Amino acid sequence: GRYRDALGVALPTGLAAAHVEGGADPLGDLLRRHARTHVPFPAAEPARRWGLGVVAVDAGLRRLARTDGLLHGSFLATGGASEWCHPEVLRSLRRRSLAALRRQVEPVPVETMSGFLPAWQGVDGGRRGLEQLLEVVGGLQGAVIPASTLERDVLGSRVRDYQPRLLDELISLGEVVWVGRGPLGSGDGRVALYRRDDAPRLVPEPADLLDGPLHTRLREELARRGASFFHDLHRACGGGDPEELTDALWDMVWAGEVTNDSAAPLRLLGPRPRRTTGRRPLMRLAPPRAQGRWSLVAGLREPAASPTERLHALSATLLGRHGVLTREAVLAEGVPGGFAGLYPVLRAMEEAGRVRRGYFVDGLGASQFALPGAVDRLRAVRDEPPGAVLLSATDPASAHGATVPWPQLAGRAARAAGAYVVLEGGRLRLFLERGGRGLLTAGEPGPEALAALATVADRVGKLEIVTVDGEPVRGSALEAGLRQAGFGPSPRGMVLWGGAGRRLPVGA
C-alpha cells in the first residue's frame, strides 16, 4: 500500500488486505525502511530508485530527521554530496570500524610467529638455481646451523631440486664462505654461512684462541702460507699422526679460526673410527675430513669494518631474517651484547623510516622492530594460516624453542639436530624426536600434517616410528593416518622408505 500511495504504482489484484493498507506518511515509511537497511546515502539514491524528484525525497528525509533522528552530514570519504544515515546504522558501522581497526593494531598471538617465519624465509618456495641459492644464503648469514642439517634440511627446503654442487660452486666462485661456530658432539658441529662481500662486517671474532702446540703451529703456518692443502700443513708442522693434525684443524674450525674452500669436509663429518695402537701407517691420502684448502678466518674480516658498520650490518641481517625482530629472537641468535646492543641502531633505522617500531607480537616485549610489509604478512598469516610445513627443529625458520615456547607435549622437545617439527595451520602439530623413533603430538594432526611428516623419509632414507606420545604406534590413534600417509608395519612399529625404496603399506 505504501508503494501505491507514495509512488502512485498500481498493485496487482488478489493481494491480502495486510499488504495493501496505506499509512499516514507512506513516503516517510519507505524512506525510513531504506535508511534502516542502507549505509549512508544521498537523497538522489532513493529518488533514482523510485523515480521521484530529489526535492520531494529530500523533504521527506528532513521530516524524518525531526521525527526519527535521521542524521545528515558527510559520512563517506567520497567528496560528493552529503548523506543521510539512520542512527542505528551509523552505530553499527562505527562498531565494525573500531573492531577492524583494533584488529589491525592489536598484536598477533605469539604462536603466529611459527607460521610466519617459514613463509617469510621462503621455505617450500619456488626458488631454484645458483643465483637464488645465493639469495637464500644472504638471508641465512650468521645463523648457527648444525652441519648435518645445513644442506639436507635448511638449504634443501628453500631451493627446489637443491644439489650439493650448487653450494660448492658458490664457494669455489668466492661468493660464499662458511665458518664454524662450535662442536656438537664428536661427529657434528655448528656452522654459519656468509656472502663473501658481507663477511668483513658479519663474521665474528673468535672468543678465545686455542693455545695447544699444534694449534699454535697451524696458526703460524696458515698465517705465513695462506690457504694450504693438508699435506703441505702436515709437512710444515713436522709430520706426525695425520689424525692428530686433523683433530687440531677441526678444533680451530669450531673455534671460528679456520675455514675451508669447500663444503666437502662438512659432509664427511660423523663418528670417527676408533684408533688402533701399533705402528702408524704411511700417509698417502689426507683424511677425508681434511680435504680441500684450509685458511684463517681472519682473512675474511678484511678490510676491517668499524664497530658501527658491524652493528648496522648485523641489525639489517637479523631484520631480513626475522621480519619482526624481538628481544627473544636476538637472544636465540646468540648476539653478543644482546638486544640492548642493537637497540640504538634499530632506533636510528626507525627514525630514518626504514623500520617500524611497535607491539606486533603478543608476549615478546614492548620494543619490536619490523620491516615494511612484515607486519601485514604477519597479520595475513594470523587471518589465513598456511598449510602443513615440515622443518628441521634447528631451522632458523622454526620458532619453537626460540621465540615461541613449546606447547604441552607428552615428552621433551628440543631444538636438536635430527629432530623435526610439522606445522599445520601455523601451529605445531608434530615433533619427531632425533632418530625418528618417537613422535609427539600437539592437538590433532590432520592428513596434511602426516603427509608432511612422511617426507622425512625422503631426506633420511628410512623413517621408522616406534612410539607416539610414549605409547606404541601400533594401535595408536595415529596408526590409520600414518598408513594413509604411506607407512607400513614393521617389527617395532611403522616404517616408510624414502625415494625409490618407498614401500606401500600392507593392504594398500
Predicted regions located by residue number:
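Long, charged, low-complexity, helical-prone intrinsically disordered regions
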Residues: 1-508
